[in-house]
From Swiss-Prot:
GO cellular component, one term: cell surface
Species lineage: Bacteria, Bacillati, Actinomycetota, Actinomycetes, Mycobacteriales
InterPro entries: PPE_C, PPE_dom, PPE_sf
Family of the protein in this entry: Belongs to the mycobacterial PPE family.
Gene that encodes the chain: PPE32
Cell compartment(s), UniProt: Secreted, Cell wall; Cell surface
Keyword hit for Secreted: yes
Job of this protein: Virulence factor that modulates the production of host cytokines.
GO biological process, one term: response to host immune response
Keywords linked to the UniProt accession: Cell wall, Secreted, Virulence
Summary of subunit composition and partner proteins: Interacts with host Toll-like receptor 2 (TLR2).
Primary location group: secreted
Protein's UniProt name: PPE family protein PPE32
SUPFAM superfamilies assigned: PE/PPE dimer-like
Length: 409
């Protein structure tokens, strides 16, 4: 740019309108901080590698790693120096600006010169202001030259200060194809291990089969033969598990079938409503109450809560022989007749009143009557036999009586 062709108003206005040297000083500080961090990283890398390769870790691997990381450490050191140089150049550029700014004519001075010239020209009626006008123009030319010189110097110094060494990219310290190669090696090793495992198990099975079959031919080795068969079966199970496991080819082939099963279960949800209704409905009697299941509805209605509470009474029981029973038993029992009323020709005394209750607990009454009847057949010494008459034992002549109780129809 030709700064000499520009008036001082433009050159001075540009210098005073800019942000000044503040951004350059901030950039210099940032470059210095980056340089310090890079120097610290390089020192840390160097000390770590040196500590590993000197004592605890020695051998081909340590030498290879140290050789691989050495270019990176060198790049960090070089980059740190470049960052430091960039910071110094930024400081130089800031100084150059301050020098050019100080050499530039302030815009107010230029404005005052132009205002004075206009005033002298306006009042120069008779030519009396001609020397003053010439002096003012000469002063303005000096300011023009001063600003042009300052701008030329500033441009040259800034060009020198802005010359920086280009930064380089960090060197490649690893093999780009190592990841793919490592994955291929791992897959190959896994496949080889699986195939060798199956081959070894097949070889073991083939070697055990003849000895196991031979041991079965003798009875003396039955126990060892069974143990051999257990080993053979276990080997077969292991082989089948390896061939059909979830990570085998056969197991991977079953993955599409899982989606089919899932859709089948979703479609089967519509058939669950009848099953749920049957599950939530009334349950049939089971266990000891299962014989009573047909009675429900035909003979026995639904169970309903009792209408009232429990009641009790005192001295209201009736007697069946010598047994106290509730009054309801007598109401539900059929009438039983004594053998004397049925067979009047016999000499047996009635063992039970004519209107004695029976039915539900008739067996109890009969057992009591039978016991009393048998008591009547016992022979008593000196006093004769005991005779049962009307439910009581009385003295009678010695005799033997058989009591037969026949319930009423």
């Amino acid at each position: 740019m030709d700064f000499g062709a520009l008036p001082p108003e433009i050159n001075s206005g540009r210098m005073y309108a800019g942000p000044g040297s503040g951004p350059l000083l901030a950039a210099a500080a940032a470059w210095d901080a980056l340089a310090a961090e890079l120097y610290s990283a390089a020192a840390s890398y160097g000390s770590t590698i040196e500590g590993l390769t000197v004592a605890p870790w020695m051998g081909p691997s340590s030498i290879t790693m140290a050789a691989a990381v050495a270019p990176y450490v060198a790049w960090i050191s070089v980059t740190a120096g470049q960052a430091e140089q960039a910071g110094a150049q930024a400081k130089i550029a800031a100084g150059v600006y301050e020098t050019a700014f100080a050499a530039t004519v302030p815009p107010p001075v230029i404005e005052a010169n132009r205002a004075l010239l206009m005033s002298l020209v306006a009042t120069n009626i008779f030519g009396q202001n001609t020397p003053a006008i010439a002096a003012t123009e000469a002063h303005y030319a000096e300011m023009w030259a001063q600003d042009a010189a300052a701008m030329y110097g500033y441009a040259g110094s800034s060009a020198t200060a802005s010359q920086l060494a280009p930064f380089s990219e960090p060197p490649q310290t690893t093999n780009p194809s190592a990841t793919a190669a490592q994955s291929a090696v791992v897959a190959q090793a896994a496949g080889a291990a699986a195939s060798s495992d199956i081959t070894a198990q097949l070889s073991q099975l083939i070697s055990l089969l003849p000895s196991t079959l031979q041991s079965l031919a003798t009875t003396a080795t039955a126990t060892s033969a069974s143990a051999g068969w257990d080993t053979v079966l276990q080997s077969i199970t292991t082989i089948l598990a390896n061939l059909t496991g979830p990570y085998s080819i056969i197991g991977l082939g079953a993955i599409p079938g899982g989606w089919w099963l899932t859709f089948g279960q979703i479609l089967g949800l519509a058939q669950n409503a009848p099953g749920v209704a049957a599950l939530l409905g009334p349950k049939a009697a089971a266990g000891a109450l299962s014989p009573l299941a047909p009675l429900r509805g035909g003979y026995i209605g639904d169970i309903t809560p009792l209408g009232g509470g429990a009641t009790g009474g005192i001295a209201r029981a009736i007697y069946v022989g010598s047994l106290s029973v509730p009054q309801g038993w007598a109401e539900a029992a059929p009438v039983m007749r004594a053998v004397a009323s049925v067979l009047p020709g016999t000499g047996a005394a009635p063992a039970l009143a004519a209107e004695a209750p029976g039915a539900l607990f008739g067996e109890m009454a009969l057992s009591s009557l039978a016991g009393r009847a048998l008591a009547g057949t016992a022979v008593r010494s000196g006093a004769g036999a005991a005779r049962v008459a009307g439910g009581s034992v009385t003295e009678d002549v010695a005799s033997t009586t058989t009591i037969i109780v026949i319930p009423a129809d």
